[in-house]
Amino acid sequence: MKCILFKWVLCLLLGFSSVSYSREFTIDFSTQQSYVSSLNSIRTEISTPLEHISQGTTSVSVINHTPPGSYFAVDIRGLDVYQARFDHLRLIIEQNNLYVAGFVNTATNTFYRFSDFTHISVPGVTTVSMTTDSSYTTLQRVAALERSGMQISRHSLVSSYLALMEFSGNTMTRDASRAVLRFVTVTAEALRFRQIQREFRQALSETAPVYTMTPGDVDLTLNWGRISNVLPEYRGEDGVRVGRISFNNISAILGTVAVILNCHHQGARSVRAVNEESQPECQITGDRPVIKINNTLWESNTAAAFLNRKSQFLYTTGK
């Protein structure tokens, strides 16, 4: 009887662990070096390098697949270089896709969860299920702020931290939405893209310049799923084309992209709207992801659009 009971409890625990799996990390904004080191530490723990997109110790990595509902927590530290304060903000990030599911005010032990993340459960906290979703479309509308041209500095992050500490209720406010947009950019998006990491980290220097998010940065974030579907096919071609994004060599890839989705994991969700244009996480299963033209790797949709425009031009000009 005891043996049967033990097996039942063990199965229950294993079943629970398959539903939710979590780890804790810290992103330290004290210095440029601590910031980059924090991001690299997280990447090492949650992803596996692609050997064919690697130079020295730098590589593009693929997120390790975990059970649905798995997440990791990121504690924000070092916003004030001189004092150990502003340390009650924790972001909850879904591991399989690096989407920010919500944030925890650790002073009140309250988890404010976005409406599109009801599948994420955090134990030991009071969960507030918000009516606001996490999409950039919604957050920009509520914030009355476009990401292209959005400025982020140490000072604005402190202000954003205070806005989230003051937040209560179940509907995002303008200030809270602006705060989330800034923190998502310098955490989740910086984990995905070295380009964003590199451009923002300068704002943590003693001269404290302001990082301004460029249209190119925004374009990267909106096409992460498409990039993730193409790069695993890369084998040293002369270039890669995904929409308006071009990589001319492996150095350009490594200087821009750090972590990609696990698009080819069997059973992984293949479609989920992630941006204003409702692009999927990864290309729908069964579609051919890439086409090679003149030793350049083209995302299939990009190639189709390009060839269509070219044929129309030839038709109208009679060439």
UniProtKB/Swiss-Prot annotation:
Superkingdom of source: Viruses
Catalytic activity: Endohydrolysis of the N-glycosidic bond at one specific adenosine on the 28S rRNA
The EC number(s) this enzyme carries: 3.2.2.22
Task performed by this protein: The A subunit is responsible for inhibiting protein synthesis through the catalytic inactivation of 60S ribosomal subunits. After endocytosis, the A subunit is cleaved by furin in two fragments, A1 and A2: A1 is the catalytically active fragment, and A2 is essential for holotoxin assembly with the B subunits.
Subcellular location: Secreted
Top enzyme category: hydrolase
Sites marked Cleavage: 272-273
Stretches assigned to coiled coil: none
Region ranges (A1): 23-272
Cross-referenced Gene3D superfamilies: Ricin (A subunit), domain 1 (3.40.420.10), Ricin (A Subunit), domain 2 (4.10.470.10)
One record GO biological process: negative regulation of translation
Protein name, UniProt field: Shiga-like toxin 2 subunit A
